[in-house]
Amino acid sequence: MKKFTGSGVALVTPFKGSKINYPVLQKLLDFHIENETDFLVILGTTAESPTLTSSEKKEVISFVVNYINKRIPIMVGTGSNDTKQTISFSRTAQRLGADALLIVTPYYNKPTQNGLLAHYKAVAKSINLPIMLYNVPSRTGVNLEVDTVKRLSKVKNIIGIKEASGNLEQVKSIIDQTHEDFIVLSGNDDQVYDVLSLGGHGVISVTANIIPLSTSLLIQNFRAGIDNKEAFIKFNKLHDMMFVESNPIPVKRALEHLGFEVGKPRLPLTKLGAKHNRMLLKVLRDYKLVDND
C-alpha cells in the first residue's frame, strides 16, 4: 500500500492551560500506533494550527517526529494564505523530519485558479517533500477546480489531494482526469465509502481521533474486496456529532470523555455547549465508547 493512503488521522493538539500537553500528545500517538492508523496528520485544522505560535509548531513537529521514529508516516499541515510564508514553514517542516506536507488552499484572500496554480507550483519547486493538496472551500472561500488539480497532478512532488468540497461529482472528475498514482483522499468522514467507491484511496479523518481502529478496518476491508456500505453508514451519527459545533470543539470533548485530557480549545473556539455535550455523551454511549454511568 502506498504511503498516505488508508486511514490518516487529523490529530488534535492537547493543551493544559496555556501550554501544549506533551504527555497527553504522547498518549494519543501511542493510541494511534496501537490501533492501526496508517498515517498521522499534524498541525491541520483539527490541530488548531491558526492558534499555535511558530515556536509551538516547530516543537510539535520535533516531538512527534522524534517519538514516532519512523513507525508510521507523518504529514504536516504547512499551508497559509501567504505563499512566501507557506514556503518558509514547509522548509522548516522538511528540515525537522516531516514525511509529507498537507497544504490548504490560501484562504480569505480568494485567489483565482491561476493564482492557486502559481501558489502550489512555487511551493512545490521550493521543497523536496511530497505535497498533498487540500481543498475545503467551506472554510477557505475558494474551490480548487478539477482542471487546476489535473494540471497540478503533473507536478512531480504533488502526490494527491484531500478533497473536502463535499461534491462527489468533482471527486469523480478528479479521479478520472488524473494519473493512476495520484492519491485522492476524502476530507469528509461521512463520504469515505463514496470516495472509495469512486476509486479514492482513503481518508484524513476527524472521527479517527476517537475510533482509529474502526476507521482503519473499514478501509482495509473495502480494499480487500469487502464492499459493506452499511458498515460505513453505521458510524454516521458519530460523524455528525463531530461537527455539531465547529471542529475540533466536539472531538476534543469526546476525547476528554474517553479519558484523554486534551483540554479546551484555544480562543476564539470555546468548549462544547452543555446541550451538545449531553447529545455527545448519549452517542458515545450508544457506540459503547464510554460506560453508561
Curated annotation (Swiss-Prot):
GO terms for cellular component: cytosol. Transmembrane segments: none annotated. One of its GO terms (biological process) is diaminopimelate biosynthetic process. GO terms for molecular function: 4-hydroxy-tetrahydrodipicolinate synthase activity. Pyruvate binds at T46, I204. It catalyses: L-aspartate 4-semialdehyde + pyruvate = (2S,4S)-4-hydroxy-2,3,4,5-tetrahydrodipicolinate + H2O + H(+). The active site is at Y134, K162. This is 4-hydroxy-tetrahydrodipicolinate synthase. It comes from Acholeplasma laidlawii (strain PG-8A).
